[in-house]
A protein has these predicted regions:
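Conserved active-site "lid/cap" helical segment
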Residues: 1-75, 82, 166-178, 188, ...
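Condensing-enzyme catalytic core mediating Claisen C-C bond formation in acyl metabolism
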Residues: 1-24, 145, 231-297, 301, ...
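N-terminal extracellular/periplasmic Venus flytrap/periplasmic-binding protein-like
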Residues: 11-12, 22-23, 27-31, 43, ...
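Conserved catalytic cysteine-centered active-site region
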Residues: 24, 56-112, 144-147, 157-163, ...
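Active-site-proximal alpha-helical scaffold in enzymes
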Residues: 87-118, 171-200, 262-269, 334-335, ...
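Flexible glycine-/small-residue-enriched beta->alpha junction loops
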Residues: 105, 111-169
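Active-site pocket-lining segment
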Residues: 168, 204, 212, 283-354
Length: 402
């Protein structure tokens, strides 16, 4: 089996819901990091890209009809370059990286772009067609997040818990207290705030310029979601979202956000042919299923499966990027894997609670941030892992070079 190298990676800033990126279409947002990679590598023959793999969770609005293909054309890649869009909900971007890696490892392709996008702000409302003449039972769904067009058989078998309800289910089943969740959230905010103040993410981010009104264009170059001024006292005042009493609040859950990320993946032959500098190697990806009502625990079996395949144990990882869908599930996963709640090598620069969670983008961001983190902090081996709605988990192992 052949090696798969990550040669470069960039992302947009993560926009707050209704924030600075609200006017940017999802396909234009996806094109932005691809354009940035093209600008960084002007001598690369971009017609040699074998495939663009992009993750996107919604696909009900401007991200419809294969946003990967739309984005690569908007970015200026030759129309001879094909593109495919993958959907594993929250793990779509990580799956795109994994799919590209598998294609390279198998020998089917040599050079790929992989990434993910989500504009949750611009997610549309949708309505199904009437099932009978003169029907007055039409339902309208907000596609920003959660269930729509529910299959009654699936509902009868597994229920249709909303995402915050799954966070409560995990908190209850794995005995994660409200106090522990709020402490976890504070750490995420503080770490992200410190990283932003130090300019840590500047090397990851490609600025987005948005046409303005009389004031002219606006350049967005920083993540908008973090609230480093958050206090435990402030979090304690927030009411639970779905249960009373409950533990999951807006303060200890991930955000609803906009963003995109992309990376160049290459075989050893492509690295040499195109004069690329490999930064890291993808060692493998694993996925696993869990009961939908506790979808947040998905990273545990996925990580265990990956570790067994690679002959690794959790202590072998110098850095872990764990998507913080909810503090409850983040803590539960860490405890199940034998990692301390406050481990400084898990999300050392904040996670989705602080930075935000643009669904299809987040997995690609985790992989990107893992590579960047090893280069900055040191360490050889990183794990990127995340839970997935309807009960799944995905994990990827990445090895730093040099």
């Amino acid at each position: 089996m052949r090696d798969v190298f990550i040669c470069d990676a960039v992302r947009t800033p993560i926009g707050r819901f209704g924030g600075s990126l609200a006017k940017v279409r999802a396909d234009d947002l996806a094109a932005a990091p691809i354009k940035a990679l093209m600008a960084k590598h002007p001598n690369l023959d971009w017609a040699q890209v074998d495939e663009v793999f992009f993750g996107c969770a919604n696909q009900a609005g401007e991200d419809n009809r294969n946003v990967a293909r739309m984005a690569l054309l908007l970015a200026g890649l030759p129309d001879s370059v094909p593109g495919q869009t993958l959907n594993r909900l929250c793990a779509s971007g990580l799956d795109a990286v994994g799919a590209a890696g598998r294609a390279i490892r198998s020998g089917e392709i040599e050079l790929a772009i992989a990434g993910g996008v989500e504009s949750m702000t611009r997610a549309p409302f949708v309505m199904g067609k009437a099932q009978e003449a003169f029907s007055r039972s039409a339902e309208i769904f907000d596609t920003t997040i959660g269930w729509r067009f529910i299959n009654p058989l699936l509902k009868a078998q597994y229920g249709v818990d909303a995402m915050p309800e799954t966070g409560e289910n995990v908190a209850e089943e794995f005995q994660v207290s409200r106090a522990d969740q709020d402490a976890f959230a504070i750490r995420s905010q503080q770490r992200a705030g410190a990283a932003i103040a130090a300019g840590y993410f500047a090397e990851e981010i490609t600025p987005i310029t948005i046409p303005g009104g009389k004031a002219g264009p606006i350049t967005v170059d920083k993540d908008e979601h973090p609230r480093p001024e958050t206090t435990l006292e402030g979090l304690a005042k927030l009411k639970p979202i779905v249960r009373n009493p409950g533990t999951v609040t807006a303060g200890n859950a991930s955000g609803v956000n906009d963003g995109a990320a992309a990376m160049i993946l290459a075989s050893e032959a492509a690295v040499k042919k195109h004069g690329l500098t490999p930064r890291a190697r993808i060692l493998g990806l694993a996925s696993a299923g869990v009961p939908p009502r506790i979808m947040g625990i998905g990273p545990v079996p996925a990580t265990r499966k990956l570790m067994e395949r690679l002959g690794k144990k959790i202590s072998d990882f110098d850095l872990i990027e764990l998507n913080e869908a909810f503090a409850s599930q983040g803590i539960a996963c860490m405890r199940q894997l034998g990692v301390a709640d406050d481990a400084d090598y898990v999300n050392p620069h904040g996670g989705a609670i602080a930075l935000g969670h643009p669904l299809g983008m987040s997995g690609a961001r985790l992989a990107l941030t893992a590579v960047h983190g090893m280069e900055k902090r040191g360490g050889k081996l990183a794990l990127a892992t995340m839970c997935v709605g309807v009960g799944q988990g995905v994990a990827v192992a990445i090895e730093k070079l040099n």
